[in-house]
């Protein structure tokens, strides 16, 4: 009986164990099923604020390494997303956002540009202010507007983008500079070009600034009136264009490649005569109506050029050359390629970009190319002390051999029967193909721009900045005009020219910025010092009378030594400045800005070395008043009044000095050159005043 009870007890225990095992397995399986059912596949599209899809945006499950990227249409699909999870959306140059899934299988995202703060904070020179707190006239070119502009220069980015700014392309040659004017001209004799400042470096006058890769630019501010530009003194007399280049975003490492092809074409075809007979008939008729002898009569004119008769053109004359098709390209192409790498952590950041640009001119054999790199490095030594360094290298080549004489008479052939170039006379200097293949005009350019700076946050309200900037530029122009086909070359039996120009610019600046709030009062102040040194040198060697033209100007010794010309020039100038600015705001409604700068320039005589440039501006944010807000009409209503004095030192470094001149005299069968005080080339002007 006891054995039976024990057996029954054992069987009951086994049943209990089996039931427990079953329940355990079932609960585990159920948990797995439940866990699987709590994860879903999420799809969606990622766009920017303009509604354009973002290619390569990163979508990641928060708290995990699981993620994906968007395709060419901005679409993405991500599996195993927790129903209550959070997705992180990020993109280079954009603000990252987080979106809760909340069981949704479709999650779309819109990312805003990380540089959108630039629309709110405006760089004004040696500092920045909120856009709403501006008292001077400043135009901002939005960052999103820059990326779609196929321009190869800083000036090109501004064309049509800022009110009051004119960008005039005076030449269609590739690589040619532009004329930039802000609110028109300010001087009859001096410079009218605005100053361009790149990352705090007053780099030079606008117009031919090719060293900066446009893909590196993230914002541009244009200081237009005297109150805004007075902080730059005489250098800002014609306005200031402030350029800010790209910096790495903390916590990211990015590699990007951009290639842009641009095709150009004439807005309208040239209206040229295609029918030589009709052209000749109308020409004769016009000359007769003007009281002149008809030209197309089957005879030579006074210059010895033969013009066939109308009958000859109708019967035996077969030439109808389309010179425009031999001179112009059908569709010139420009190619812009940029590769950039950037990375940043809490202490160190760097951005390196390399660029190569080629541009075909509208004329055949008229080309421009440039290449270089831009390196920016920043390192925080201590929590309140940062050093920065940058270096830009630019190499350029310009070939200016094309063009000329697309208007050449279509009755003239390109070649003679023996393959030589057809010339109407021995003095025919307008054959475009002959000139293109024998003339030489090439320019090589080199620029190096280096900057170093430190920034010390002394206290939360006070920041001290000091920076050194150096620019070196050099260009070499090679020209050769052959003995045939060019007038200068014919008259001088071949002419070779080698021209070299070299310039150096050094700028040292130290300034302090202070800001503080006291209740409804907000005060900002800046005080600084600047020293600038500039030097220019050129030299030219010209040789004439080449016995052998095989090497052109590569063998200048082949020219007759008696006809060689050597010339050179040199100039140097200095500028010492002190500047200060005060910004005051009361109750976020009433604003005051006062600026003062003193410039001491070596270009002026001893009696007027210094120029003083004060400015002031007041502003009223009317939309912040309660009675205006009640109207519910204005998002922003602001009144502004400004006044300032600016001066211009865009004159020759030695214009105010008496200068020795040269003269030639004949002595003992030869011409001699004399130089001395008896031959002044310019009168002194020690009392010359600033403009």
Segments (PLM) and residue ranges:
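Extended, hydrophobic alpha-helical segments in both membrane/secreted and soluble proteins
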Residues: 217, 373-375, 466, 508, ...
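Long hydrophobic segments that form regular secondary structure
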Residues: 455, 459-460, 691
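Short, well-ordered amphipathic alpha-helices
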Residues: 44, 182, 199-201, 375, ...
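Surface-exposed loop/interface segments of Gram-negative outer-membrane beta-barrel transport/assembly proteins
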Residues: 132, 250-323, 331, 361-368, ...
